[in-house]
Amino acid sequence: MRTTLSIDDDVLLAVKERARREKRTAGEILSDLARQALTNQNPQPAASQEDAFHGFEPLPHRGGAVSNALIDRLRDEEAV
């Protein structure tokens, strides 16, 4: 079903990025996330106010530092 919604820029950016990574549409991602939230599937612990940034909880630390060289290499690989 098609509809028009106003979505915050940061939310849309996150949805589009996830859709790109999962090779799905933004609509599919939003539908799944809304369905999970509305049916309380996969409940996530609430981020504390100081941990949350624009409503998104930071990803857990995976080890290693992110350097400018790494960022440049990833940009080159993704043609960004």
From Swiss-Prot:
Keywords: Toxin-antitoxin system. The lineage of its organism: Bacteria, Bacillati, Actinomycetota, Actinomycetes, Mycobacteriales. It comes from the Bacteria. It comes from Mycobacterium tuberculosis (strain CDC 1551 / Oshkosh). This is Putative antitoxin VapB44. Residues 40-68 are annotated as: Disordered. Possibly the antitoxin component of a type II toxin-antitoxin (TA) system. Its cognate toxin is VapC44 (Potential).
